[in-house]
Amino acid sequence: MSTFMANKANIERKWYILDAAGKPLGKTAVRAADLLRGKLKPTYTPHADCGDNVIIINAGKAVLTGKKGEQKFYRTHSGWVGGLKETPYRILMQEKPELALRVAVRGMLPKNTVGKDSLKRLHIYADANYEQQAQKPVVLE
C-alpha cells in the first residue's frame, strides 16, 4: 500500500457558501482560508492545491469586535516617497466591502503559488446575490 499524494487528477473540488452577516471578519476569513487550502479534508497535502471553492456573501455586513472599527486602517504604498495611502475601515466598508475580507483571507494563505492559486477560487459579494447558483454550493454556518 502506498502513501496517497494529491494532484490535479485526483482532487475533487466542492463549492461552499459562507454568510458573513453579523459575524466577525476574522472568523469568517479563517473559515474561508481553511476551505481554500483544503485543511478540512483527509486528503490534505501541504504542497498541493487541494482546496475547495468558497463564496462569501453579505461581506458588507461583517463586523469587527472592540474598537477596531474606528482604529483599523488599510494601507497601500505606491513605492514613491510620500506614496502611503491610508483608508479607515468604516470608509472601506462603504466603498469596497469585499476588499476587507479579501485582504484578511490573503494574509492567512501561504505566500507562494499555492496561496495565489487558492485565492483565485475565492468569490466575495457585498450582498446576498451571487452568480454561482449553477454549481449548487453547500451553505455552511
Segments and roles (model prediction):
Residues 1-103, 113, 131-141:
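Ribosome large-subunit tunnel/peptidyl-transferase-proximal elements
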Residues 102, 106-125:
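C-terminal structural segments of small proteins and small subunits
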Residues 124-132:
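Short, highly charged C-terminal tails/helix-capping segments
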